C-alpha cells in the first residue's frame, strides 16, 4: 500500500494539518495541488493505496482551483481521507464538495475530518493552530495502523 498526501496549502496551514495526520504513516508521496507546472492528469493512484486529501475552506467551500486540479487525478478506487481546514469560523459544504469530487475522480472516501488552522488573513483567529494538542489528536484520528487493520 502506497500513501499519498494530496494537498492545497497556499499559506501553510493546511500543510501543517496534513503533516500532523500523516506523521506516523510510512513513506508518503506528496502531490501539491498549488503547483503550476504539474500535469495532475498524469497521476494514477494504485487501487490499494491510501490518500489524504487536504484543502482549506474559504467562504464555506474549497478553492475552485484546488477542486479542478484534484478532479484530474485518477483515484482508481483507492481509499481516501478528506480534510477540510478552516480558520476557526466554519467549513460549510467543503467536505461535501471534496467528497463529490473524490467520488467522481474514482476515489473511495472512507473518512472525513474538519481541522482548525490559523486564519490565513486575520491571524488572531485560531492563532498558533494547529498546536501540539491538535497535532496529537490529528495523528491519532487517522492512524495508518488502524486503517490497515480494517481493510476490506
Protein language model features and the residues they cover:
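Short N-terminal binding/cap micro-motifs at the start of the first secondary-structure element
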Residues: 12-18
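Conserved anion/nucleotide-ligand pocket segment
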Residues: 130-134
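Extreme N-terminal starter segment of soluble prokaryotic enzymes
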Residues: 1-4
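A contiguous pocket-lining binding segment that forms or flanks enzyme active sites
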Residues: 137-143
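A short, Lys/Arg-enriched amphipathic alpha-helix followed by its capping loop at the start of a domain
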Residues: 20-27
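Conserved small/polar residues in nucleotide/adenosyl-binding loops
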Residues: 145-152
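A short acidic, helix-capping loop that chelates divalent metal ions and anchors anionic groups
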Residues: 119-125
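Helix-loop-strand module that forms the ligand-binding subsite of alpha/beta enzymes
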Residues: 34-117
Amino acid at each position: 500500500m502506497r500513501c499519498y498526501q494530496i494537498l492545497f496549502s497556499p499559506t501553510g496551514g493546511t500543510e501543517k494539518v496534513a503533516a500532523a495526520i500523516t506523521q506516523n504513516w510510512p513513506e508518503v508521496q506528496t502531490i501539491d495541488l498549488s503547483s503550476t507546472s504539474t500535469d495532475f492528469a498524469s497521476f494514477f493512484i494504485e487501487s490499494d493505496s491510501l490518500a489524504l486529501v487536504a484543502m482549506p475552506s474559504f467562504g464555506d467551500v474549497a478553492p475552485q482551483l484546488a477542486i479542478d486540479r484534484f478532479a484530474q487525478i485518477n483515484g482508481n478506487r483507492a481509499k481516501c481521507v478528506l480534510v477540510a481546514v478552516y480558520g476557526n469560523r466554519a467549513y460549510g459544504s467543503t467536505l461535501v464538495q471534496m467528497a463529490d469530487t473524490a467520488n467522481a475522480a474514482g476515489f473511495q472516501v472512507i473518512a472525513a475530518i474538519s481541522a482548525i488552522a490559523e486564519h490565513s488573513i486575520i491571524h488572531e483567529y485560531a492563532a498558533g493552530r494547529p498546536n501540539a494538542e491538535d497535532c496529537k489528536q490529528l495523528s491519532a484520528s487517522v492512524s495508518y495502523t488502524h486503517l490497515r487493520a480494517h481493510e476490506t
